Amino acid sequence: MVTSSLQTIAPQRDIDGSLFLVNRTYRISEDYVPQVVQADVSGSLRSMRPEAAAALEEMFAACKEEAGVTLVTVSGYRSYQKQKNIYNNKLKSVGGSEEKADEYVARPGASEHQLGMAMDVGQRNSSAGLTSSFADTKGGAWIAENCWRFGFILRYQEGWEDITGYSYEPWHVRYVGLEHAQAMHEANVPMETYMEDLREQVMIDLLVLE
């Protein structure tokens, strides 16, 4: 379920679809718990939905073969309560400012990690961690250029902050499936814009059918 009065947009309407949009407007209920598996890759907190985990394994293997670096998982699936704890900790660290906390951490129910379709990734033996410097690593650069080939998108890109609502995160990949990942990559648009375009196309198609 989503707590927003609006529902997700065609072509995949159910919350288990890979194109389910989650942000500050479209939220997930507290009791939603997806089926997840442990991706067979290096790192911690490796849980993702099965289709996303399989794609992640392929992507990590390709990065090792093509770029010669080992990617590691940092944070995959998170429960509603886990996200709540993370948000509250960030809130404390910024002196209680919700505006500042919202720039960096999703509120509970507004995190793609609860879907089981997102993963924060890093590069082994790199000091960049989950910072903008990850984009300058060999692994980060490879991810930016190639993740779409495996059905992933870089969800929060630089320059899209006003649309996505979140700061630049070169380490955060979201699984949407091959077709949609390629389309978003070629159009160079955030998921919100892509979904809006889909909505408009669906409306046009319905008018034509009438």
Residue ranges and their predicted role:
Residues 1-76, 80-210:
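Extracytoplasmic cell-surface/polysaccharide-interacting catalytic and binding patches
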